[in-house]
Amino acid sequence: MATYGMANERLRALEEIEREIAAILLNAGNVILELSKEKPNERVLDKQATQFTASVQRVESELSGQIRYLTQVATGQPHEGSSYSARKDGTMALNRIDYARVKLAELSRTCDQMLEQP
C-alpha cells in the first residue's frame, strides 16, 4: 500500500508542476498584454518578470527532482526487462525541459527588448 501512497504523492507533485506551468503561461500573457499598451507600467512589468522567473525556477527544480527520482527508480531496481521505454521517456522529458528553457529565454529576451524601447 505504501507504493500507492508514494505514487499518488508523485502524481500530486506533477499536477502542481502543471499548475505552475499554467501560471507561467498566464504570467507571460500578462506581460505581453502590458507591453502592448501604449504606456506600459514598469512596476507591473517588474512584478510580472519576478513572478515569471521564480515560477520557472520552481518548475525547473521540481522537474529535475522528478527526473532524478525516475532515474534512481529505473536504475536501482533489479532487471525486469528492457529499460528502453524509461530511457526514452527520460530523454524526451529532458528534451522538453531544454525546449522550454529555449522558449523561456526567447520570451525573456523579447520582454527585455520591449522594456528597453523608449
Curated annotation (Swiss-Prot):
<protein>
    <recommendedName>
        <fullName>Mediator of RNA polymerase II transcription subunit 11</fullName>
    </recommendedName>
</protein>
<keyword id="KW-0805">Transcription regulation</keyword>
<keyword id="KW-0010">Activator</keyword>
<dbReference type="GO" id="GO:0003712">
    <property type="term" value="F:transcription coregulator activity"/>
</dbReference>
<dbReference type="Pfam" id="PF10280">
    <property type="entry name" value="Med11"/>
</dbReference>
<comment type="function">
    <text>Component of the Mediator complex, a coactivator involved in the regulated transcription of nearly all RNA polymerase II-dependent genes. Mediator functions as a bridge to convey information from gene-specific regulatory proteins to the basal RNA polymerase II transcription machinery. Mediator is recruited to promoters by direct interactions with regulatory proteins and serves as a scaffold for the assembly of a functional pre-initiation complex with RNA polymerase II and the general transcription factors.</text>
</comment>
<dbReference type="InterPro" id="IPR019404">
    <property type="entry name" value="Mediator_Med11"/>
</dbReference>
<dbReference type="GO" id="GO:0006357">
    <property type="term" value="P:regulation of transcription by RNA polymerase II"/>
</dbReference>
<comment type="subunit">
    <text>Component of the Mediator complex.</text>
</comment>
<dbReference type="GO" id="GO:0016592">
    <property type="term" value="C:mediator complex"/>
</dbReference>
<keyword id="KW-0804">Transcription</keyword>
<comment type="similarity">
    <text>Belongs to the Mediator complex subunit 11 family.</text>
</comment>
<keyword id="KW-0539">Nucleus</keyword>
